[in-house]
C-alpha cells in the first residue's frame, strides 16, 4: 500500500513538473512575440508562432495521460523516462550551447550529443521492456525520456532569444534561409527561426523516440525472455 502511495505521489510530482515545463515554454513564446510585435508583420510569421504552441499543448495532453496511469509498469515507465530524459536534456543543452557560443559547432562536435540522446532513448525503451516484459511500456519510457529532454532543450533555446538575440542575428545574417525568405527584418527572422527549431525538435523527438524505443524494446524483450528460459541454480540442483 505504501509503495502504491509513493508511486502515485511521484506521478503527481512528475505531472506537475511536466505541465510547468510546458507552461514555461508557452510563456516564453507568447512573451517573446509581445516584446517584438513586428514579427507578426512578416510573411507567414503567425504560422511559426502557432506550430510550437500546438505541439506544446499536445505534449501537455501526453504528459497528463502518462502520469495518470497506475500500476508498477507505469511507475517503471516514468522512473526510467525521467532519469534518461534528464541525462539527455543536459546533453542537448550542452550541444545547443556549443552550436551557439563555441567555435566547435560543426557536425563532429555536436553529433555525439544528438545521436547519443537517440541511443539513450533506445536504452530507455530496452529497460522498460526488459523490466515489464512488454513492448509498449518500453516505447512509452522512450517517449517520456524524449519529452523531458526536448522540453528542457526548447526552453533553453527560447531563452536565448531573450539573452543572446544579437548573436543569433549575426549567425543568421548571411543564412541562405534568410536570404530566400523574403523577410526584411533580421531580428524577426532570428526569433521565428528559433520557434521553427523548437517545433522541429518537439515533433522530431516524438518520432525518433518511438522508432528507437521500439528497437530498444525489441532488445529488452529478447533479454527478458532469455532470462526467463535460463534455468535457475536451484532447479539444476533439484534435477
Go through each PLM region and give its residues.
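Transmembrane alpha-helical insertion/packing segments
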Residues: 2-120
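Transmembrane alpha-helical segments in integral membrane proteins
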Residues: 60-66, 121-125, 198-229
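Cytoplasmic juxtamembrane interface segments
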Residues: 121-157
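Short, highly charged, low-complexity non-transmembrane loops/tails of multi-pass membrane proteins
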Residues: 171-177, 227-239
Amino acid at each position: 500500500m505504501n509503495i502504491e502511495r509513493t508511486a502515485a505521489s511521484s506521478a503527481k510530482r512528475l505531472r506537475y513538473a511536466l505541465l510547468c515545463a510546458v507552461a514555461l515554454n508557452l510563456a516564453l513564446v507568447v512573451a517573446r512575440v509581445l516584446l517584438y510585435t513586428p514579427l507578426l508583420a512578416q510573411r507567414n510569421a503567425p504560422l511559426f508562432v502557432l506550430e510550437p504552441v500546438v505541439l506544446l499543448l499536445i505534449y501537455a495532453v501526453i504528459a497528463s495521460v502518462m502520469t495518470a496511469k497506475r500500476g508498477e509498469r507505469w511507475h517503471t515507465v516514468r522512473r526510467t523516462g525521467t532519469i534518461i530524459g534528464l541525462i539527455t536534456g543536459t546533453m542537448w543543452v550542452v550541444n545547443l550551447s556549443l552550436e551557439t557560443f563555441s567555435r566547435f559547432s560543426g557536425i563532429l562536435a555536436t553529433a555525439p550529443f544528438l545521436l547519443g540522446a537517440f541511443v539513450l532513448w533506445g536504452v530507455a525503451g530496452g529497460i522498460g521492456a526488459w523490466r515489464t516484459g512488454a513492448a509498449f511500456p518500453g516505447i512509452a519510457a522512450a517517449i517520456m525520456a524524449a519529452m523531458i529532454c526536448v522540453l528542457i532543450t526548447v526552453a533553453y533555446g527560447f531563452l536565448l532569444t531573450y539573452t543572446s538575440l544579437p548573436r543569433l542575428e549575426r549567425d543568421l545574417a548571411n543564412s541562405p534561409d534568410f536570404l530566400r525568405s523574403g523577410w526584411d527584418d533580421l531580428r524577426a527572422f532570428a526569433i521565428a527561426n528559433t520557434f521553427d527549431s523548437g517545433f522541429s525538435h518537439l515533433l522530431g523527438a516524438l518520432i525518433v523516440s518511438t522508432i528507437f524505443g521500439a528497437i530498444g524494446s525489441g532488445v529488452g524483450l529478447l533479454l527478458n525472455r532469455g532470462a526467463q528460459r535460463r534455468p535457475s541454480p536451484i532447479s539444476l540442483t533439484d534435477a
